[in-house]
Regions:
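Conserved core of the PLP fold type I
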Residues: 1-93, 104-122, 127
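Bulky hydrophobic/aromatic packing residues
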Residues: 52, 68-70, 97, 154, ...
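Short beta-strand/loop segment that forms part of the nucleotide-sugar
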Residues: 98-103
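PLP-dependent aminotransferase class I/II
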Residues: 125-172
Length: 172
C-alpha cells in the first residue's frame, strides 16, 4: 500500500550525500531502498520501553536527508505521541524530511496516540504515509497515500513511474 511512498521517499530524499536515520527494530523497507540509493543507513536502537529514542535520532540526523518514524512501530507496536514528534520536528533542520509511517494507525486503541497529519500544515518537512492495505483488506492492490506539502509531492513525483498505481487500485 504505502510501499511506493517509502520507495519514492528514499529516492527523492536520500543518496550518497544524504543519509537516512531510522529506528532499530522497525519496518525495514525504506532502509533497503535508501541503501540502494547509496545512502548511509543509521539505525538508532529503541529506548528500553520500545519507544523511538527521538533524542538520539535528532543527534544522528545532522546532515540527513530523511528520518523515518514508523508510528505505531512495526514490529513492536510501540507508539510515539504526536507532541513528541512535534517537538522533534521543531528541533530538526527543516532541510531534513521526516516521514511518519502510519500504516497501523487504525489498530491503535491507546489514548496516548494521535495522528501527526494535523502537523503537516505547520511543518513543511513532515510527510505522513498511510495505506489502504491493512484495515480495508486491500493488500494485493498496493494502494496508499501521502499527506505532505506540495513541494515534497513534487520531489516524490520526479521519481515516480507513470504506472506506479495499477488501474484496479485506482478504481477501488
Amino acid at each position: 500500500g504505502s510501499g511506493e511512498i517509502l520507495k519514492l521517499s528514499a529516492a527523492a530524499f536520500t543518496g550518497p550525500d544524504k543519509k537516512i536515520v531510522t529506528a532499530n527494530p522497525t519496518f525495514e523497507s525504506i532502509a533497503r531502498h535508501a541503501s540502494v540509493a547509496g545512502a548511509d543507513v543509521v539505525k538508532i536502537d529503541l529506548a528500553s520501553d520500545y519507544s523511538h529514542d527521538l533524542k538520539k535520532m535528532l543527534a544522528a540526523a545532522n546532515g540527513a536527508g530523511l528520518v523515518y518514524i514508523c508510528n505505531p512501530n512495526n514490529p513492536t507496536a510501540s507508539i510515539t505521541p504526536a507532541k513528541e514528534i512535534a517537538d522533534f520536528l521543531g528541533k530538526l533542520s527543516p532541510a531534513t524530511i521526516v516521514l511518519v509511517d502510519e500504516a497501523y494507525h487504525h489498530y491503535v486503541e491507546s489514548k496516548d496516540y494521535e495522528s501527526v497529519i494535523p502537523l503537516v500544515k505547520d511543518y513543511p518537512h513532515l510527510m505522513v504515509a498511510r495505506t489502504f492495505s491493512k484495515i480495508y483488506g486491500m493488500a494485493g492492490l498496493r494502494c496508499g497515500y501521502c499527506v505532505t506539502q506540495t513541494g515534497n509531492i513534487r520531489r516524490l513525483r520526479n521519481h515516480q513511474a507513470f504506472d506506479s498505481v495499477n488501474i484496479m487500485a485506482l478504481v477501488a
